[in-house]
């Protein structure tokens, strides 16, 4: 990495700090952004924030958010650095309409051939040269904006804030999310479109746009059959779009797999059927598939202790989650800026997983998103050190002192797997534009209202044994679920985690942004024993949790094999 700037002041990155004059990175939290995929395993891309550049002169270009290509094999570029900045010094006339502040996130990603890169909300093009080639210079580099109906990606377009875009491995399609926040709704929908270069306008347009959503009951998490029999239905389980499988033929997303645990799913573009990739991550969203398709690298909250009080009991079906509670549970995963992510290697064959950095410093937390090297032998991810207000002052956790070069609060990690031999990446053919189960989308088209189960009493049979009786209540219009209660009688989907007892969740008002109150009195038996209980008046979460501000009334405690897990302090 470039050295750390002594300060943000102009000129602080002197020749004494970096004799090559190729810049210094900021020491601030998050200054080393997400790594990005490159098709040659000797390199990885990385978004960074430079600081301390002089106001004038050749080194002045190393300023603000930029994208690097970084050597991973211990060698250097001709100037002696292990990195090359590929966006620094690009003339403004060569990048019109591009949001350079997005160079650190979403992650950069190389198109097949490594001559074009997704950087920020644009496509960097170095003509006939790969970006690692010395002949690829700033003057010869163009960054073309990506537009949706004439508006730049990243803007609020058609009522939805476009975010979290990811390049399909086919190099032809892009996926993204639209976050919809109005007075009466808070939702997110996934999209896919084809990148088409408009020569006359010198930009990429997103065409053949499809919303990766279907309002039919066949694509909802639970389906009601005759006699009120409920059936879990893994289809359309994208939730928030998070990327692609290695062959580009399935969208990665997050949805509840067990109650109060938000897991990774792969949903087929051809059929809409979904399969879980993680079994009980508690929460995950940063993820990347190995180029050979055999592994995932998921950043998960399990193992950090953050969500164990609400997510720690396995074997509970995601019934109360259908209120929905997902946004509230996911909000607990952060303490202000602090994320509690840990990197896990996950098998795509059976979901078995292992923490990559077990025994690491818990004050360093993984940051979105990770990436694999192209030969599927190693992974790269960024980490941030906990900083105020998540530590210090009234917080019981003292703020640690960074031991990284220059005292910086971000770092980039590379983990190699000696037992994984180099293997070729899947070479995906372009996927079809049409998604048969999706919804063709035209800008301005109203966002759908997600369907839900109607009020009533239902029965859910365990896949292995037992039953659950489910009671759903709605508001007077039937438009909003206001409460879900469940009674479990020897319920088990896997035959090893057996659930008995009752639980419920309710809105405290007929509003999407209402406080939510949980009542839990559950018992676990089988391979583990435990309880999940709330205080007599329940556990109530403020909607401030949607802004990652933990404010709760009452308590929830989960005990597994004698170990009790309690909630964070308010404000933590």
Where are these regions (language model features)?
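Sequence signature of WD/YWTD-type beta-propeller architectures
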Residues: 1-572
């Amino acid at each position: 990495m470039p050295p750390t700037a002594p300060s943000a002041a102009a000129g602080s990155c002197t020749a004494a700090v970096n004799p090559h004059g190729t810049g210094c990175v900021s020491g601030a939290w998050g200054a080393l952004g997400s790594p990005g995929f490159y098709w040659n395993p000797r390199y990885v891309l990385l978004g960074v924030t430079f600081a301390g550049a002089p106001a004038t002169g050749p080194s002045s270009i190393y300023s603000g958010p930029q994208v690097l290509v970084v050597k991973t094999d211990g060698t250097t570029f001709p100037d002696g650095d292990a990195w090359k900045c590929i966006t620094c010094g690009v003339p403004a006339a060569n990048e019109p309409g591009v949001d350079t502040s997005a160079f650190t996130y979403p992650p950069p990603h190389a198109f097949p051939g490594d001559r074009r890169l997704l950087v920020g909300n644009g496509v960097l093009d170095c003509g006939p040269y790969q970006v690692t080639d010395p002949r690829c210079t700033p003057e010869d580099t163009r960054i073309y904006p990506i537009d949706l109906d004439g508006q730049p990606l990243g803007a609020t377009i058609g009522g939805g804030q476009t975010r979290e875009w990811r390049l399909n491995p086919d190099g032809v399609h892009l996926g993204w999310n639209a976050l919809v926040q109005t007075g009466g709704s808070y939702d997110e929908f996934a999209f896919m479109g084809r990148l088409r270069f408009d020569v006359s306008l010198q930009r990429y347009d997103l065409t053949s746009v499809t919303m990766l959503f279907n309002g039919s009951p066949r694509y909802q998490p639970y389906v009601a059959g005759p006699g009120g029999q409920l059936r879990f239905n893994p289809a359309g389980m994208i939730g928030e779009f998070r990327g692609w499988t290695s062959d580009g033929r399935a969208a990665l997303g997050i949805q509840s797999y067990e109650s109060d645990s938000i897991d990774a799913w792969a949903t087929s573009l051809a059929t809409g059927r979904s399969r879980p990739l993680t079994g009980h991550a508690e929460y995950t969203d940063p993820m990347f598939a190995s180029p050979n398709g055999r592994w995932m690298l998921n950043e998960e909250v399990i193992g950090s202790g953050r969500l164990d009080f609400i997510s720690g009991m396995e074997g509970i079906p995601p019934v109360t989650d259908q209120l929905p509670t997902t946004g509230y549970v996911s909000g607990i995963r952060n303490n202000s800026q602090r994320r509690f992510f840990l990197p896990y290697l996950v098998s795509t064959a059976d979901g078995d997983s292992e923490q990559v950095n077990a025994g690491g410093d818990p004050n360093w937390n993984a940051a979105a998103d990770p990436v694999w090297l192209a030969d599927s032998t190693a992974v790269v991810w960024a980490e941030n050190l906990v900083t105020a207000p998540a530590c210090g002052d009234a917080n019981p956790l003292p703020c640690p002192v960074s031991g990284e070069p220059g005292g910086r609060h971000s770092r980039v990690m590379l983990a190699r797997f000696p037992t994984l031999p180099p293997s070729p990446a899947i070479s995906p053919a372009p996927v079809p534009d049409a998604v048969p189960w999706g919804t063709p989308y035209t800008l301005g088209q109203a966002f759908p209202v997600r369907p839900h189960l109607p009020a009533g009493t239902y029965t859910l049979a365990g896949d292995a044994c037992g039953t659950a009786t489910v009671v759903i209540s709605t508001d007077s219009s039937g438009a909003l679920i206001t409460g879900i209660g469940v009674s479990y009688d020897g319920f088990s989907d896997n035959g090893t985690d057996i659930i008995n007892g009752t639980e419920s969740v309710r809105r405290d008002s007929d509003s999407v942004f209402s406080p939510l109150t949980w009542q839990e009195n559950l018992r676990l038996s089988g391979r583990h024993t435990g309880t999940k209980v709330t205080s007599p008046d329940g556990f109530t979460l403020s909607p401030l949790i949607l802004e990652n501000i933990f404010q709760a009334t009452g308590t929830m405690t989960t005990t597994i094999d004698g170990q009790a897990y309690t909630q964070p302090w308010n404000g933590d």
